[in-house]
């Protein structure tokens, strides 16, 4: 059996190798749940949080072992999208960030080391920039929701898994690369 139900948090984390917290996206809830997991889990166990925007430095404040806590943000839907953004907090042991990345890579995910604790991390910030532009075009009656969704779905949405947005522009710049595109 791979799926087990526990009657308490203590029972849920007593014989594990890793904990992935998935509490609601409210800072006070994340802080309390991480502190409870930290108290109940053996001290050598790494604790990952699925937060989509909070810094680990904000969430690890009540943990007795904050060095073992990392953001481990899977991208939805996680059964299809391999990305897991991994970033430590101010008190996180950098070796445990490496461990978490290796863990996710070993289970077929793509563990992306985020070098800074940015609100929303990397993927959500890039996605939100595009979303802001889409909302701007809709508000100004420049495009419809359907046009924008179709444009991304059948255009860059298909290309970006191969090249990503920056490599796409670098290649489009020809011999001068992205520098030529910026001129």
Where are these regions (language model features)?
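Rossmann-fold dinucleotide-binding core
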Residues: 49-125
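Generic secondary-structure signature for well-ordered alpha-helical cores
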Residues: 39-42, 64, 102-110, 136-140, ...
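Rossmann-like NAD(P)-binding element
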Residues: 1-47, 54
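N-terminal alpha-helical segment
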Residues: 30, 79-80, 130-131
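Helical "substrate-binding/catalytic lid" subdomain
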Residues: 117-183
């Amino acid at each position: 059996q791979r799926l087990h139900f526990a009657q308490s948090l203590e029972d849920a984390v007593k014989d594990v190798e890793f904990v992935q917290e998935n509490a609601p996206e409210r800072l006070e809830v994340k802080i309390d749940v991480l502190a409870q997991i930290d108290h109940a889990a053996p001290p050598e166990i790494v604790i990952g949080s699925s937060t989509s925007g909070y810094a680990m430095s904000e969430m690890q404040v009540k943990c007795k072992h904050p060095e073992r806590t990392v953001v481990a943000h899977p991208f939805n839907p996680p059964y299809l999208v391999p990305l897991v953004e991994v970033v430590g907090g101010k008190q996180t042991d950098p070796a445990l960030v490496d461990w978490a990345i290796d863990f996710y890579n070993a289970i077929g995910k793509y563990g992306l080391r985020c070098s800074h604790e940015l609100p929303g991390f990397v993927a959500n910030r890039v996605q939100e920039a595009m979303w802001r532009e889409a909302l701007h075009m809709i508000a100004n009656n420049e495009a419809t929701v359907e046009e924008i969704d179709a444009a991304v779905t059948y255009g860059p949405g298909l290309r970006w898994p191969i090249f990503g947005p920056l490599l796409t522009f670098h290649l489009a710049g020809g011999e001068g690369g992205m520098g030529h595109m910026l001129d």
